[in-house]
Curated annotation (Swiss-Prot):
Belongs to the TrpF family. The lineage of its organism: Bacteria, Pseudomonadati, Pseudomonadota, Gammaproteobacteria, Lysobacterales. InterPro entries: Aldolase_TIM, PRAI_dom, RibuloseP-bd_barrel, TrpF_fam. One of its GO terms (molecular function) is phosphoribosylanthranilate isomerase activity. The keyword Amino-acid biosynthesis applies. It is an enzyme of class 5 (isomerase). SUPFAM superfamilies: Ribulose-phoshate binding barrel. It catalyses: N-(5-phospho-beta-D-ribosyl)anthranilate = 1-(2-carboxyphenylamino)-1-deoxy-D-ribulose 5-phosphate. This is N-(5'-phosphoribosyl)anthranilate isomerase.
Length: 218
């Protein structure tokens, strides 16, 4: 996706504490994510996410992440949390994803061996607001803390994409330069333990993304 200026969007995912949500806003992060996937160690209840939502700064997106949840589970989150963007990490098809009449990202597993084709993705999910390339294998979940080969990101996408999977303050500079993503998504790379973010790593991650943006513009 061609761009005449460059600012990589940043999403912090797997938030479980209001203080971390508040710091994300102070650092200028564009979106925070709450995980509702049943098997995730960072899963929060809708009521917990609603309480943390009060700490979100203005103009910061609230992303609700699902993986093979039922329609009723998704609707409960919509009613309780009022997210601005949905993110689907499972085997959800196009019909399921668009049935909630909200913008959504579809996560694509990059941990397998098969080639990921941009045209195929866009035909399979024509209503997606964008795609998120993560390092999990097909059928698996995200949050592994392991990066994939960034050269496998498909070319020819005509909508935004986010890079995820194993990103951290030590490698995100190189990741941005290698893939020029619309945005980056991080969870375990800024944590002390699952769901518990580290303020120093949060701040350093943002600084490294901005340093990469300045390099792109040179």
């Amino acid at each position: 996706m061609s761009r005449s200026y460059y600012r990589t969007r940043i999403k912090f995912c797997g938030m479980t504490r209001a203080g971390d949500v508040r710091l994300a806003g102070e650092l200028g992060v564009d979106a925070v994510g709450f995980i509702f996937a049943r098997e995730s160690s960072r899963r929060v209840a809708p009521a917990e996410a609603r309480a943390m939502r009060q700490a979100i700064a203005p103009m910061v997106d609230v992303v609700a992440l699902f993986r093979n949840n039922s329609k009723e589970e998704v609707r409960e989150v919509l009613r309780t949390v009022r997210p601005t963007l949905l993110q689907f990490h499972g085997e959800e098809d196009e019909s399921f994803c668009r049935s909630f009449n909200m913008p959504y990202l579809k996560a694509i597993a990059m941990g397998g061996r098969e080639e990921v084709n941009a045209r195929t993705l866009q035909l399979r999910y024509p209503s997606a607001a964008g795609f998120l390339f993560d390092s999990h294998a097909p059928g698996g979940g995200g949050g592994t803390g392991v990066a994939f080969d960034w050269s496998r990101v498909p070319t020819g996408l005509h909508r935004p994409f986010l890079l995820a999977g194993g990103l951290n303050p030590e490698n995100v500079y190189d990741a941005v330069l290698a893939t020029l993503p619309w945005g980056v998504d991080v969870s375990s790379g800024i944590e002390l333990e699952p769901g518990i973010k580290d303020g120093y790593r949060m701040r350093t991650f943002v600084e490294e993304v901005r340093r990469a943006d300045c390099t792109v513009l040179e």
